[in-house]
Swiss-Prot record:
Protein name listed in UniProt: Small ribosomal subunit protein uS17
Gene that this sequence comes from: rpsQ
Organism annotation: Leptothrix cholodnii (strain ATCC 51168 / LMG 8142 / SP-6) (Leptothrix discophora (strain SP-6))
Example GO BP: translation
Family annotation (PANTHER family): 40S RIBOSOMAL PROTEIN S11 FAMILY MEMBER (PTHR10744), SMALL RIBOSOMAL SUBUNIT PROTEIN US17M (PTHR10744:SF1)
Similarity comment: Belongs to the universal ribosomal protein uS17 family.
GO cellular component: a single term: cytosolic small ribosomal subunit
Gene3D superfamilies: Nucleic acid-binding proteins
Top-level taxonomic group: Bacteria
GO molecular function, one term: structural constituent of ribosome
Complexes and interactors: Part of the 30S ribosomal subunit.
Function in brief: One of the primary rRNA binding proteins, it binds specifically to the 5'-end of 16S ribosomal RNA.
One family name in Pfam for this protein: Ribosomal_S17
Length: 98
């Protein structure tokens, strides 16, 4: 590497790889917080059948923009409270009106 490339590499900030997940908002009752249900499919260890697994995450929603039924993308962040370590980054799909 030349001297110029070394200086540029040293000046560039370190890129942090954060996990991102996509899920459905199942609760928006708390202030600045939404509960997101993330579903995934996994193979059963003993029987080999593909089964649905799910987990709920509490995510930070600063302005209260996201409502029940919205599909959102969440990314991992620093701990914001006892149970909240995720932040909603974008809206993937708006909830359908029934």
């Amino acid at each position: 590497m030349s001297e110029a490339q070394t200086a540029v590499a040293a000046a560039a900030p370190a890129v942090k790889n954060t996990r991102t997940l996509v899920g459905k908002v199942v609760s928006d009752k708390r202030a600045k917080t939404v509960t997101v249900l993330v579903e995934r499919r996994a193979k059963h260890e003993l029987y080999g059948k593909i089964v649905a697994r799910s987990r709920k995450y509490h995510a930070h929603d600063e302005n209260g923009d996201y409502k029940m039924g919205d599909v959102v993308e969440i990314s991992e962040s620093r701990p914001l409270s006892k149970t909240k370590n995720w932040v909603v980054t974008r809206l993937v799909e708006k909830a359908r009106a029934v």
